[in-house]
Amino acid sequence: MRMHNKIQLLSVLNTHLVAYPTPMNLNYSWNGGSLAGMMLASQMLTGILLAMHYVGHVDYAFASVQHLMTDVPSGMILRYAHANGASLFFIVVYLHVLRGMYYGSGAQPREIVWISGVVILLVMIITAFIGYVLPWGQMSFWGATVITSLATAIPVVGKHIMYWLWGGFSVDNPTLNRFYSFHYTLPFILAGLSVFHIAALHQYGSTNPLGVNSQSSLISFGSYFGAKDLVGALFLALVFSILVFFYPDLLGHPDNLIPANPYSTPQHIVPEWYFLWVYAILRSIPNKAMGVLAIGLVFASLFAMPFIGLGGGKFRIITEWLYWTFLADVLLLTWLGGNEITPITSFVGQCCTAYLFFYLLVCQPLVGYLETQFAHGTQTN
């Protein structure tokens, strides 16, 4: 008798990771889930090791990071593995989300899969932001000041929330301690949400490029797609190694190599690159409250996508074309978010933001509905 039949936990793992029936026509764009899980495990491991050397105090935080880099054996590799691992984690998850949008992977009956995925993305963003503050560099400090002050846009309770986040009347030691605590805790919540995400997916099974719910063309995941995922994992490990060992500061900001100074504001305050598209939307709207509302509306639209969209754009020509314009729009917003505000970048940012909402709130439901009606009319004739 096999061991996994004797031990319940091994039986569950075998059912969901080895014997799980998978459509045989999946391509490499379906590697995102396993690669994201690999990066989450890497981030948790390196984060726990970094926490052993980090000091959560405004007077020692920056020095403790420098001590880790110079005095701890392999400390530099550990720090850069965590920093660049966050970037690769977001790249993998963004590609995973974009694949889901393209193929309509969140369409009914898989709404819970999509919604739980958006929740995971939100928790990732919060975790990464508060982690960016911990080195207590110049950009960390001022980024925390700018982003936490957005809470004042909330009517009535906004200032109270901001002061609670700060733990006082400015970003200081209580803020750093709270962020350190949250940053250590949230990855474990992410792991739990990931398990729920997988469980929701396995309830109805994986989608496929054709969008056909077939129960006949299925093969076990472990024997075949495990090897395919291994190829993706090796490629990701190669990119990861190149970043860590050859270009460790490529995706970072040089101002964060300077200790935080509350009396000197950086010329251009920017978050990490994977938040730049959100930052560009926020900057394109002059009113703070409306900017925060716009960000909330973006994520509300993502939550509502299984209900307002009518499947992916793989076989819908207009939807597919609009999808690629949406992707170009997000990339342009990312570029704009990393540049200083000028009349031209401000105008282009407003145009890109307007198109983003036009795509999410108008194109998704309307064009999908019109294409469906046209297809039904063609079949009837």
UniProtKB/Swiss-Prot annotation:
GO molecular function, one term: ubiquinol-cytochrome-c reductase activity
InterPro entries the UniProt entry points to: Cyt_b/b6_C, Cyt_b/b6_C_sf, Cyt_b/b6_N, Cytb/b6-like_sf, Cytochrome_b, Cytochrome_b_C_euk/bac, Cytochrome_b_N_euk/bac, Di-haem_cyt_TM
Subunit structure, interactors included: The main subunits of complex b-c1 are: cytochrome b, cytochrome c1 and the Rieske protein.
GO process terms (BP): respiratory electron transport chain
Compartment(s) of residence: Mitochondrion inner membrane
Entry keyword set: Electron transport, Heme, Iron, Membrane, Metal-binding, Mitochondrion, Mitochondrion inner membrane, Respiratory chain, Transmembrane, Transmembrane helix, Transport, Ubiquinone
Known cofactor(s): heme b
Residues at which heme b b562 binds: 82, 183
Positions that bind a ubiquinone: 202
Protein name in the entry: Cytochrome b
Sites where the protein binds heme b b566: 96, 197
Organism: Chlamydomonas reinhardtii (Chlamydomonas smithii)
Similarity section: Belongs to the cytochrome b family.
Record's function text: Component of the ubiquinol-cytochrome c reductase complex (complex III or cytochrome b-c1 complex) that is part of the mitochondrial respiratory chain. The b-c1 complex mediates electron transfer from ubiquinol to cytochrome c. Contributes to the generation of a proton gradient across the mitochondrial membrane that is then used for ATP synthesis.
Highest classification ranks of the organism: Eukaryota, Viridiplantae, Chlorophyta, core chlorophytes, Chlorophyceae
Pfam families noted in UniProt: Cytochrom_B_C (PF00032), Cytochrome_B (PF00033)
